[in-house]
Amino acid sequence: MSGNSIGQNFVVTTFGESHGVALGCIIDGCPPGLELTEADMQHDLDRRRPGTSRYTTARREPDEVRILSGVFEGKTTGTSIGLIIENTDQRSQDYSNIKDLFRPGHADYTYQQKYGLRDYRGGGRSSARETAMRVAAGAVAKKYLKAVHGIEIYGFLSQLGPIEAEHIDREQIEQNAFFFPDASKLEALDEYMRELKKSGDSIGAKVSVIATNVPVGLGEPVFDRLDADIAHALMGINAVKGVEIGDGFAVVTQKGSEHRDLMSPEGFASNHAGGVLGGISSGQPIVAHMALKPTSSISIPGESMTVQGNTAEVVTKGRHDPCVGIRAVPIAEAMLAIVLMDHLLRHRAQNQHVHSETPVLGMRS
């Protein structure tokens, strides 16, 4: 398995399995001198960790991160930052009934075919448990981006099943267990999730993530366009089946006169492009959305087969999220932060002395 790293100048490599001893990651390329403690990462880890509400998995993991290297006297040294989180609440016996079965919609079958064996305990490496280390690494990137460049990143659940946010109130996002920005829909969300859990089924979701104060110029055309790398990072999150930048698939019905973001010395008139033009950041907010499938780990019986190829019925036991999109919000923030951090360092390496006479545009007020 060789796809465990992301980034060129800010490189994040993760390791570990859902029911293994621990999860870990190595961060290479973080500039020296950044003040960093475990507390800087713990906030986002607590937002992602399981067992924090009745809407998510009952697995309870403290997800307490430890810094192993790369930090001395509270500051990054410029060397590799090693991080680790121990697994403490594994219940591998919950998966003994699927040891020789494939769960429909999961990575069981493809891992078995690719590697000739698989860790059936909670999905092993394919489990979303792995994303805890992405969130930890993303928190490092988020701190640097804000401290050095004033870049802020925030995400929210913009749709759960048929319930869509109609109003975006940023202050509301952290005030409820759904990370939902529209307070008028919270009661409907609660009722929907109650009925969903009773049925033993699951549901998909849409998560939006936004970065503000991003400077002009990030992105490396043609193959490492900023939007391409953002899409790559978000698509690499478990259960994500679609990514949009800006207006995304809505551009299919837009006309050119409607979609183009008109410019004047006063700024851009709109942001249909999502803050990226020609693969390079425009200075407007970076806006991305991702669609997450409903988890296949449900208690409703389904047809499948055994490792030997015999027909079988599967009923998934264990502790699972009825909607994986809820805990995906801090993961999306982390992946966007990692991409922006990487591109900032790449841009600095080649273009830090470039000067343009053209004024930098913002959004019109």
UniProtKB/Swiss-Prot annotation:
<dbReference type="InterPro" id="IPR000453">
    <property type="entry name" value="Chorismate_synth"/>
</dbReference>
<feature type="binding site">
    <location>
        <begin position="293"/>
        <end position="297"/>
    </location>
    <ligand>
        <name>FMN</name>
    </ligand>
</feature>
<comment type="subunit">
    <text>Homotetramer.</text>
</comment>
<keyword id="KW-0274">FAD</keyword>
<dbReference type="GO" id="GO:0008652">
    <property type="term" value="P:amino acid biosynthetic process"/>
</dbReference>
<feature type="binding site">
    <location>
        <position position="319"/>
    </location>
    <ligand>
        <name>FMN</name>
    </ligand>
</feature>
<comment type="similarity">
    <text>Belongs to the chorismate synthase family.</text>
</comment>
<feature type="binding site">
    <location>
        <position position="54"/>
    </location>
    <ligand>
        <name>NADP(+)</name>
    </ligand>
</feature>
<feature type="binding site">
    <location>
        <begin position="238"/>
        <end position="239"/>
    </location>
    <ligand>
        <name>FMN</name>
    </ligand>
</feature>
<feature type="binding site">
    <location>
        <begin position="125"/>
        <end position="127"/>
    </location>
    <ligand>
        <name>FMN</name>
    </ligand>
</feature>
<dbReference type="GO" id="GO:0010181">
    <property type="term" value="F:FMN binding"/>
</dbReference>
<feature type="region of interest" description="Disordered">
    <location>
        <begin position="41"/>
        <end position="60"/>
    </location>
</feature>
<keyword id="KW-0288">FMN</keyword>
<dbReference type="Pfam" id="PF01264">
    <property type="entry name" value="Chorismate_synt"/>
</dbReference>
<dbReference type="InterPro" id="IPR020541">
    <property type="entry name" value="Chorismate_synthase_CS"/>
</dbReference>
<protein>
    <recommendedName>
        <fullName>Chorismate synthase</fullName>
        <ecNumber>4.2.3.5</ecNumber>
    </recommendedName>
</protein>
<comment type="pathway">
    <text>Metabolic intermediate biosynthesis; chorismate biosynthesis; chorismate from D-erythrose 4-phosphate and phosphoenolpyruvate: step 7/7.</text>
</comment>
<feature type="binding site">
    <location>
        <position position="278"/>
    </location>
    <ligand>
        <name>FMN</name>
    </ligand>
</feature>
<feature type="binding site">
    <location>
        <position position="48"/>
    </location>
    <ligand>
        <name>NADP(+)</name>
    </ligand>
</feature>
<keyword id="KW-0057">Aromatic amino acid biosynthesis</keyword>
<dbReference type="GO" id="GO:0005829">
    <property type="term" value="C:cytosol"/>
</dbReference>
<keyword id="KW-0456">Lyase</keyword>
<dbReference type="GO" id="GO:0009423">
    <property type="term" value="P:chorismate biosynthetic process"/>
</dbReference>
<keyword id="KW-0028">Amino-acid biosynthesis</keyword>
<dbReference type="InterPro" id="IPR035904">
    <property type="entry name" value="Chorismate_synth_AroC_sf"/>
</dbReference>
<dbReference type="GO" id="GO:0004107">
    <property type="term" value="F:chorismate synthase activity"/>
</dbReference>
<keyword id="KW-0521">NADP</keyword>
<keyword id="KW-0285">Flavoprotein</keyword>
<comment type="function">
    <text>This reaction introduces a second double bond into the aromatic ring system.</text>
</comment>
<dbReference type="GO" id="GO:0009073">
    <property type="term" value="P:aromatic amino acid family biosynthetic process"/>
</dbReference>
